[in-house]
Swiss-Prot record:
A single cellular component GO annotation: cytoplasm
Disulfide cysteine pairs (residue numbers): none
Protein known as: tRNA N6-adenosine threonylcarbamoyltransferase
Enzyme Commission number(s) from the entry: 2.3.1.234
Residues annotated as binding Fe cation: 118, 122, 316
Species per Swiss-Prot/TrEMBL record: Cereibacter sphaeroides (strain KD131 / KCTC 12085) (Rhodobacter sphaeroides)
Length: 364
């Protein structure tokens, strides 16, 4: 039995400045504190996250977040066993702010420093919340990423497929912007879609006619733009019903694509022969109600357990980073002062790059 470990986690990969303290005793884990300082108001006027503004805000807020996390946990630095920090992938300015703070704390205290892949934090969250056993199938679906992974260990992931262009969260945000809805786009589009007719617009279901688990959402976004422009040209603007129907049609298309691709991923995962087969979902888009409902139905039909973290742990947070740091530390992972911030960091380094990875390679 491994000894109890208490880790501080630091997260600053996008537009949430976060710190948390997690204690693990064997397979049991307890979140002693979790502080998240969002930046939505700072970026609202720009319709999206501005990297320079985000980086400056992280630099200003990280110290205070760490202080609050320790205070709420009732602990000091001397009570910790290690420091975990998101080292990528993400917006490099923010990631660098977090890494530099973590290095300073580790150097000043002598505590172990563990760099964590942000996506591993999401992917390992079901083990933090439910003690899920390896191997399990993970659908990581967020603002910047969308991929199916078989999680076999704290640092062992096999990618089955993913989005070759826009991630669903990015598509939700852009849809909200096109329709004049507030950011973040996911909750806004979901709320608007609740009163809409998903059958009014014949939006495409990209890549369902192709085998495999890869996805595409940029064409769906373009189809919505054309439908919006057609309505504006015809009527001179959008009614509330138009906006609701556009959101409902867009959301229904995303749900159908994710559900069908999940069925295919489960078929591949079945070959793992897991004693307790499970499908888990994580990432900000996992907070979407219709997506959760569809994935629950797919899992039930396949006879596998379905897990989704509490909504507060679906979006970016530092508790998942602290936990992933503990998992990696237990497996022998540890970093020194040479730890660097990485804008791109694929979880499955052996998988071929997705079509839309670009010349610099896959982000994740």
């Amino acid at each position: 039995m491994s000894r109890p470990l208490t880790f501080l986690g630091i997260e600053s990969s996008c537009d949430d400045t976060a710190a948390a303290v997690v204690r693990a005793d064997g397979a049991r884990a307890e979140i002693l504190s979790s502080v998240v300082d969002g930046q939505t108001a700072l970026h609202a006027a720009f319709g999206g996250v501005v990297p320079e503004i985000a980086a400056r805000a992280h630099a200003e807020r990280l110290d205070l977040c760490v202080e609050r996390a320790l205070e709420e946990a009732g602990l000091g630095l001397r009570d910790l066993d290690g420091i975990a920090v998101t080292a990528g992938p993400g917006l490099i300015g923010g990631v660098l702010s977090g890494v530099m703070l973590a290095k300073g704390l580790a150097a000043g205290t002598g505590l172990p420093l563990v760099g964590v892949n942000h996506l591993a934090g999401h992917a390992l969250t079901p083990r933090l919340t439910d003690g899920l056993a390896f191997p399990y199938l993970m659908l990581l679906v967020s603002g910047g990423h969308c991929q199916f992974l078989i999680a076999r260990g704290a640092e062992e992931f096999s990618r089955l497929g993913g989005s070759i262009d826009d991630a669903p969260g990015e598509a939700f945000d852009k849809t909200a912007k096109l329709l004049g809805l507030p950011q973040p786009g996911g909750p806004s589009v979901e709320a608007e879609a609740a009163t809409g007719d998903p059958r009014r617009f014949a939006f495409p279901r990209p890549m369902l006619d192709r085998p495999g688990c890869d996805m595409s959402f940029s064409g769906l976004k373009t189809a919505l733009l054309r439908a919006r422009d057609g309505l504006v040209a015809e009527k001179g603007g959008l009614t509330r019903a138009d906006r609701a129907d556009l959101c409902a049609g867009f959301q229904a298309a995303v749900v159908e694509v994710l559900a069908e691709k999940t069925r295919r991923a489960l078929a591949v995962y079945a070959a793992e022969g897991a004693a307790e087969p499970a499908l888990a979902v994580a990432g900000g888009v996992a907070a979407n109600g219709p997506i959760r409902a569809a994935l629950t139905s797919v899992a039930e039909a396949a006879g596998v357990r379905f897990l989704a973290p509490p909504l507060r742990l679906c979006t970016d947070n530092a508790a998942m980073i602290a936990w992933a740091g503990i998992e990696r530390f237990r497996a022998g992972g540890r970093d020194g002062m040479e730890l660097s911030a990485r804008p791109r960091w694929p979880l499955d380094r052996s998988a071929p790059a997705l079509i839309g990875s670009g010349r610099k390679g896959a982000k994740a």
